[in-house]
Amino acid sequence: MRKIVAGKLHGIHVTEANLDYHGSITLDPDHCEEAGILPMEFVEIWNKNSGARISTYVILGERGSRCCILNGAAARTCQPGDQIIVCNSIYLDEAHITSLKPRIVTFDQDNNILDRLSYSVDLDPDGRYCFSILDEADEALAIPALVSGA
């Protein structure tokens, strides 16, 4: 079993940092559903502004709020306005890698969704892996893909 990316909120902006809360990251349920992120799921958080990398669990905020709130100790690593990547993962047998289609969501400055992408791993005629980033129409983008929220 290997740890594989399952979904990402890419370039979402921190709306609040609450040091006195119990811990976690509070996210809009609409955003979580788009990327396949579950409540209480452990996620990795990568801060594009500072380079900080942490792990915490997800709690759901108010639906439609576009919130991204770092709580407890995590609040020390991300400040309001920071652009972060929230990534969930699964453990998967390599034989099933071609059936996984991670969902990636990108955001504007106000945490409105810009792009809905997916990752795809396929086998070429020689049995080697090939990787694609697909847009909403399942069209492959150039790699590295320069999408509006990247």
UniProtKB/Swiss-Prot annotation:
Record PTM text: Is synthesized initially as an inactive proenzyme, which is activated by self-cleavage at a specific serine bond to produce a beta-subunit with a hydroxyl group at its C-terminus and an alpha-subunit with a pyruvoyl group at its N-terminus.
Cofactor binding note: Binds 1 pyruvoyl group covalently per subunit.
Compartments, as annotated in UniProt: Cytoplasm
Catalytic machinery residues: 24, 57
Pfam families: Asp_decarbox
Keywords carried by this UniProt record: Autocatalytic cleavage, Cytoplasm, Decarboxylase, Lyase, Pantothenate biosynthesis, Plasmid, Pyruvate, Schiff base, Zymogen
GO CC annotation, single: cytosol
Function: Catalyzes the pyruvoyl-dependent decarboxylation of aspartate to produce beta-alanine.
Stated name of the protein: Aspartate 1-decarboxylase 2
Species: Mesorhizobium japonicum (strain LMG 29417 / CECT 9101 / MAFF 303099)
